[in-house]
């Protein structure tokens, strides 16, 4: 099979991360989600904790200056490209570096935009019914429904703002992706199988052309 890159965007509680991991296993490649934070930290010289605090958020420096810069590594502060755009570039470079090394699945972090000029890229967006998403967050976070709904609203607002700002596109809008699918209809397992078959068919079309 030819080299392939799969980008998975997802609503919170949709099972997107689980599906991405299953796709990676299906296609024999590595799945990058929070692992990208470690790669970006290595690229930048900043601590991984700094990237964790600002993951998929447009306002990178809010937590930074409110907490008196505890997340910098030992590298000289002024020798790093210390700006919001600079930090985004470190993460983008980490995504490109991973993509150059072989087949991979990326979860979120505007990977679809970062890799827009790469060949054999498939962009997927996974949604789910709000009730299913609330249940998933309740279980994962051990919180009640009201708190879960608030968690979803707050984090998706941040995620959309981050995506829209850096890509000039709209997070979750169908025109940004090759396939959008609601995991509530088929469940996690069957949704992954459906996506995998779509990817195989799409890859065949790319090869034949």
Where are these regions (language model features)?
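Extreme N-terminal starter segment of soluble prokaryotic enzymes
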Residues: 2-5
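ATP-dependent small-molecule kinase phosphotransfer cores
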Residues: 41-103
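Glycine-rich phosphate-binding P-loop
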Residues: 8-21
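Conserved phosphate-donor/acceptor-positioning beta-strand/loop module used by diverse small-molecule
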Residues: 117-140, 145-153
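Short beta-strand-centered segment that lines the nucleotide-binding/catalytic pocket of NTP-utilizing
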Residues: 30-41
